[in-house]
């Protein structure tokens, strides 16, 4: 499915029901938004590990702007934008304070989202990530260690 967040359309996949039919009052299951690594990857890398939680949570796999099946011009690939995309995504779909999981690059986006929109997340789960990524420093180090070809890849 796709949702319009302004200057991009974000692809997402939902696994698990939002309502728990096994309870008399049809209680809401917690929503877990899963943010993949990259940029350049898509949500499919997370599916084998998280689908098993669909009996207790509603899982929403989200492809970041410019990744997977999401659109988004390269000029808009900014950490602020990726974080704000999550806020617009949640607002558009009526998702209130989800649990947010971020792996690698997705963890950086998740932390930035939580910092910019602190009431927009109930819990934050991080895996194999860093608090910041300095592309300019990475390119400089790649040039020093391996020349132009590795620097172009970075």
Predicted segment positions?
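Short acidic-hydrophobic surface loop/beta-edge motif
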Residues: 1-5
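Conserved HGGG/HGGXW glycine-rich cap/lid loop of the alpha/beta-hydrolase fold
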Residues: 6-75, 79, 89
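Short, well-ordered alpha-helices that flank and scaffold nucleotide-derived cofactor binding pockets
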Residues: 55, 88, 115-119
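The conserved SAM/SAH-binding core of class I Rossmann-like methyltransferase domains
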Residues: 60-62, 103, 127
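Conserved acidic catalytic loop of the alpha/beta-hydrolase fold
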Residues: 80-98
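Conserved alpha/beta-hydrolase "nucleophile elbow" surrounding the catalytic nucleophile
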Residues: 98, 102-104
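Short glycine-enriched nucleophile-adjacent loop
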Residues: 107-118, 124
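Flexible "cap/lid" loop of the alpha/beta hydrolase fold
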Residues: 122-154
């Amino acid at each position: 499915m796709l949702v319009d967040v302004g200057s991009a359309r974000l692809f997402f996949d939902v696994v698990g029901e939002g309502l728990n039919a096994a309870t008399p009052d049809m209680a809401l299951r917690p929503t877990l938004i899963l943010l993949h690594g990259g940029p350049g990857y898509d949500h499919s890398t997370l599916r084998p590990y998280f689908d098993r939680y669909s009996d207790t949570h509603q899982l929403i796999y989200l492809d970041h702007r410019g990744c997977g099946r999401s659109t988004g011009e390269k000029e808009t690939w900014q950490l602020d934008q990726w974080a704000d995309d999550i806020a617009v995504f949640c607002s558009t779909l009526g998702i209130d304070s989800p649990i947010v999981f971020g792996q690698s690059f997705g963890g950086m986006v998740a932390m930035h989202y939580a910092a910019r929109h602190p009431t927009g997340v109930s819990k934050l789960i991080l895996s194999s990530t860093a608090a910041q990524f300095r592309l300019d420093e990475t390119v400089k180090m790649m040039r020093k260690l391996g020349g132009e070809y590795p620097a172009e890849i970075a």
